[in-house]
Amino acid sequence: MSALTPASEVILRHSDEFLSRRVLFAGDLQDTLPAQFEAASVRVHCNQYHHWQQMAKPLGDNAQYSLVADAELVADSDTLIYYWPKSKQEAEFQLCNLLSLLPVGAEIFVVGENRSGVRSAETVLSDFVELVKIDSARRCGLYHGRIDKQASFTLDDWWDEYVTEGVTVKTLPGIFSRDGLDPGSRLLLSTFEPHMKGKVLDIACGAGVLASVLAKQSPKIRLTLSDVSAAAVESSNATLAANALEGSVIASNVYSDIDGRFDMIVSNPPFHDGLQTSLQAVEMLIRGAVTHLPIGGQLRIVANAFLPYPALLDAAFGSHEVLAQTGRFKVYQATVGRPPRTGKGRRR
């Protein structure tokens, strides 16, 4: 069994409870417990593409990646195990969706690390479920209840938007900087000149703000956007449509589903996976960039100044430059150079 998160270890303390149940897993899944879980049936709803990739092979069609759960996936389940995410709004969105599909009488278990804010589950679900805390271990809480009332869920009710740099940005719960342009992205955008050309890939695109602002400034660029988050994919498509921009939006774990080369790769990459600090995605972004850029192609990213990206950039590209910086952020650029010539040298 792969390493389990503290939340999953708490669930396993109650494993006998689930042997005869038809279980649906959802929320901030960080391990492969559902693929090895003993129950009458197991289904998983993932809204993070890299989480779904771990589940798809062992569970097949019983693992689904999407923004909202499919009614057929949920219909046969009598028990929901929900992993609380760090974003309360995201939890409200997902649980409202799931509780609109699960029948009255279905049981729900909510688990999460104390620092995630899982304590607020009782309040969030109070209109539909009376939750009771049944376990506390590994700095996690586990809550249990029975659905008394179905929720009403309409996706249109959950959209927000803001305007920045002349671009209307459409956002959903769980999106980074949902309420406005963050300082790091603003610094990154300040380094671009208008009237660029070529193919641009925006990785970890969020609501699509970077790509959309660049396309407004440089209408001749061709856009590809990618993210692991189903909410980000949906938001980016909506942002492009709201601004009459064209582009391809792809669910991808960094480069897992990206083909071809690009003239520039841009990103404000995350350095957390859920609550955990993780540089894995950034390392994949930097190391993989050289295979998706031609000679002269550029990777341009913004990051918190304390993060160890210079060494990663130098290892992958040979060198890098800092285009802009503040006390908190730095914008790095690395360019693919020509490989050194091999052979015996020039003929005289």
Curated annotation (Swiss-Prot):
Assigned GO CC terms: cytoplasm
Reactions catalysed: guanosine(1207) in 16S rRNA + S-adenosyl-L-methionine = N(2)-methylguanosine(1207) in 16S rRNA + S-adenosyl-L-homocysteine + H(+)
GO molecular function: 16S rRNA (guanine(1207)-N(2))-methyltransferase activity; nucleic acid binding
UniProt cross-references to InterPro entries, sorted A to Z: DNA_methylase_N6_adenine_CS (IPR002052), Mtase_sm_N (IPR013675), rRNA_ssu_MeTfrase_C (IPR023543), RsmC/RlmG (IPR046977), SAM-dependent_MTases_sf (IPR029063), Small_mtfrase_dom (IPR007848)
Enzyme class, spelled out: transferase
Keywords assigned: Cytoplasm, Methyltransferase, rRNA processing, S-adenosyl-L-methionine, Transferase
Domain of life, per lineage: Bacteria
EC nos: 2.1.1.172
Chief localisation class: cytoplasm
Pfam families hit by this protein: MTS, MTS_N
Annotated localization: Cytoplasm
Entries under SUPFAM superfamilies matching the protein: S-adenosyl-L-methionine-dependent methyltransferases (SSF53335)
Similarity comment: Belongs to the methyltransferase superfamily. RsmC family.
Function, as annotated: Specifically methylates the guanine in position 1207 of 16S rRNA in the 30S particle.
Classification via HAMAP family: 16SrRNA_methyltr_C
Self-association state and partner proteins as the record states: Monomer.
Protein name, as recorded: Ribosomal RNA small subunit methyltransferase C
Species this protein is from: Pectobacterium atrosepticum (strain SCRI 1043 / ATCC BAA-672)
